[in-house]
Amino acid sequence: MIKEFPKPIQNMLWTGLIFMFTAKVQGTMTDLIISKKNPDLKKKFVATPKIVPRDYLKKRVEYWEKQFGSVKNEFVEIFSEELSSEEVRRITKIHHLRNMIAHAHVSDGRDYMMYRPHGGEKLEQKLIEDLGIQLSDEAAEPMLLKIEFWKEEEFQAVSNLISSITEDTFVRLANNLGIPIGQIS
């Protein structure tokens, strides 16, 4: 039986789930990059679904040590011919959401988390543009963003965003490379 939690705890739980799905996105991008850049390793990897070949695992570990943004940038570059501008926009949005979650101010005393973008006004404007944020006249100065994933519509919107990449984009790219999606996802 699932117990109903107070909103602050529910927000932390749902935010944690979203964060883990962004980690899954990063891992899948990693496998797609490795497979595209290393066709011989890909063949060995696909041929042994229950055991990851040592050389392939070494490549994975190299990517596990990288930040999401570095993996995302390489992924977008390597698959530039196969990604639509909308898919790149969605992956960028996932990157921003991951950073927001990772750097949020968390409290179990309120039903939202706060995130303060860093990097100056230019980067703030890019974040606002990439996420489609509409600032009100009463917006905090400096800008603070609320994370309210306890709200079902907010959680569902992010879930749909991630699903559009994992279930459409990644499946298509894996098929193009001849990799069973279940092996990398």
What residue spans do the PLM features occupy?
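Canonical alpha-helical transmembrane segments
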Residues: 73-74
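C-terminal structured domain segments
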Residues: 137-146
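Short secondary-structure subsegments characteristic of cysteine-rich extracellular domains
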Residues: 115-138
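Amphipathic alpha-helical interface elements
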Residues: 1-70, 85-96, 100-113, 147-185
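Short acidic (Asp/Glu) patches
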Residues: 77-86
